[in-house]
Amino acid sequence: MPLAPVLRAQAATYLIACNFAELAAQRRFKPLIVPRHPQRFDEVQALAEAQGLRVSRRSSWPAAGPVESVEALQADAWLGDTLGEMALYYGLASVALLGGSFAPLGGQNLIEAAACGCPVVMGPHTFNFLEAAELAEAEGAALRVADMGEGVQAALRLVNDSAALAKAAHAGLAFAARNRGATDRTLAALKPYLDDLQAGG
């Protein structure tokens, strides 16, 4: 079940480009759509429902998650309409489609998905996270495609290939472990200079 975060004004474009209604009808996957901004929750639900999808929102699930919600299990698509739960969403997903990388928005932090063992499929626009995106791609933790249509097909191929999916998930975990401590290492390197400044040096 791929995860497809949808960002900003591109929500409608993404939903249409992915043919979510057709794919959901074929039970090929269940999209979990996570808008970046709360004010887009209702709009994204309306867009999905306009394509004939039955939508279940995270806020309606019990604390245990969708597995204990009949509504969620019967839905064609899930909508992540809560804040601070990306780890939950990535944990539920088989593959992450980074919505912000399919338009010139600069991409998203893919280390969070990788740390959850969720393979990443990203588009061409990752200039805000260029180094991380290039490293993840080189290490097999992320796959880059030209557009969202290709992204959905790449995600489906991974979902249908358990060995490739497991390999990508392990690569993501290893990539995240190597890169998670970057801030701490930077602060440690700067500490002598900060100490000198505080001492008036």
Where would I find each of the regions flagged by the language model?
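Nucleotide-activated sugar donor-binding and catalytic core shared by glycosyltransferases
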Residues: 1-201
